[in-house]
Structures are given as structure tokens and as C-alpha cells.
Amino acid sequence: METQSEEQAVTKPADSGGEGGPPQVAGAQAARPEDRMTLLLRLRAQTKQQLLEYKSMVDANEEKTPEQIMQEKQIEAKIEELENEVEEAKTAFEMKKLALDRMQLSTALKKHLEKVDIKTSVLMDNMKQILNLNKLIMKSQQETWDLEEKLLDVRKKRLQLKQASERKLLEIQTEKNKQKDDLDSMENSDKIKAIQQNLETEIQITTVIQHVFQNLILGSKVNWAEDPALKETVLQLEKNLTMI
């Protein structure tokens, strides 16, 4: 419903104003923004439909893969970009339409005054001043549109950088998952199991030797706490090798 109302709003023809050439010029100049807005609205509707279909497919799965999350973020960012372009196009269209209406009104009034009374110099001067002001307004609006286009380019570049960073994060996550899988496969291999068994055997033997040395030192009744070297040796013997 929202898309249909917006399409009706943007495709409504501008008021013709008066008779003669200016209304036709307004219609010709307003046609291109209308076509652009209609295209943007159609693209936004198609993208939304694709997102809904994609979400329904994802909901059928138990969990999302990093690739699916990445694609979903890209689609949402594209929808936001299209919505911004639609709003900017609508604003630009309205501003152009208002400026053209002002110029048409000023031109029609000027011609009317020329026909009614050629001596109305004060009004003619005012009308010329109004026309000059309209030209200045159009120039300022053009500069504003140029700045908006530059801002849009900056936003697009920022979006591209964001997508590139997300792709890099996805690559890092994929590499981490691969390393984890490789490590799991190594832990399950017979070679790793044999190494672990040998290590446990060596730890047990070393622990027995530690206990023997501790008993020898304690049995000798030497005050090992006063001898720094002997104290360090005793403290080393108290370490639990299974925690290393």
C-alpha cells in the first residue's frame, strides 16, 4: 500500500498554470524526475520482496551461516540506500516544481502587465527583480543538488567500505572455523592420541621423581628454607605438572 501511494504521488502531473509554452516546459522538465522516482520505487519494492522471500527461506533453517548473515545485511543496506534516494528525488522534484511555478507565474504576470498598461514601470521593475531573485534561487538550488549528489557519493563509498570490512570479517571467521576444524581433526587422530599418552606417562614418572626428591630433602632434616638454592628446588618440586 505504501509503495502504491508513493507511485501515485510521484506520477501526478504538475499543474499546467496558464496557456502557452511555459507549462509544456514544466511538464517536460518534470518528466525525468518522475521517471527516476518511479524506477526507484519499483526497485525498492522488488528489493523488499526479495528480502521477505529470503527471510522466509532462512527461517526454515535452524541456524544462519555467516554468508547468509552477510547477504541479509547487504540487502538491508541496499533498501536503506534506495529509500534515501527516493526521498532525495521527491524533495528535488518538489523544489524544481515550486521554482518553475514561480517563474511561470512571474512571466505570465509580466506579459499581462505589458498588455494592460505599458506605463506601469514600478510593477515592471518589481517583476524584473522577482525574476532575478528566482534565477538566484534556481542557482542556489542547483548548488544544493550538487552538494547532495556529492553527499550521496560519500555515502555510497562508506557503504562500500562497510561491505568490504564485513567481507573481510567473514573471511577471518571462515578461516577461524577452518582452523578449529583442522585442530579437532588432529585431536581425533591416532598420532595425537599416542603423543598424549606418552606425555601423560612422562608426567607420571616425573611426578614420582619429584616425590622421591621431596622425601629425601625432608628426611635429611636439612633447613632448606634458609638455603635460597635449596628453597627454590623444593618449590619447583611442588609444582603440579598436569597443570602446565
From Swiss-Prot:
Keywords, comma-separated and alphabetical = Acetylation, Centromere, Chromosome, Coiled coil, Isopeptide bond, Kinetochore, Nucleus, Phosphoprotein, Ubl conjugation
The entry's localization annotation reads: Nucleus; Chromosome, Centromere, Kinetochore
Locate the region Disordered: 1-33
Please list the residues that carry the modification Phosphoserine: 16
Q: Which residues carry this modification: Phosphothreonine?
A: 65
Q: Which GO terms describe its cellular component?
A: kinetochore; nucleus
Q: Which protein family is named in the record? A: Belongs to the CENP-H/MCM16 family.
As for what it does, the entry says: Component of the CENPA-NAC (nucleosome-associated) complex, a complex that plays a central role in assembly of kinetochore proteins, mitotic progression and chromosome segregation. The CENPA-NAC complex recruits the CENPA-CAD (nucleosome distal) complex and may be involved in incorporation of newly synthesized CENPA into centromeres.
What's the subunit arrangement here?
Self-associates. Component of the CENPA-NAC complex, at least composed of CENPA, CENPC, CENPH, CENPM, CENPN, CENPT and CENPU. The CENPA-NAC complex interacts with the CENPA-CAD complex, composed of CENPI, CENPK, CENPL, CENPO, CENPP, CENPQ, CENPR and CENPS. Interacts with KIF2C and NDC80.
This chain's protein is named Centromere protein H
Q: Which gene encodes it?
A: CENPH
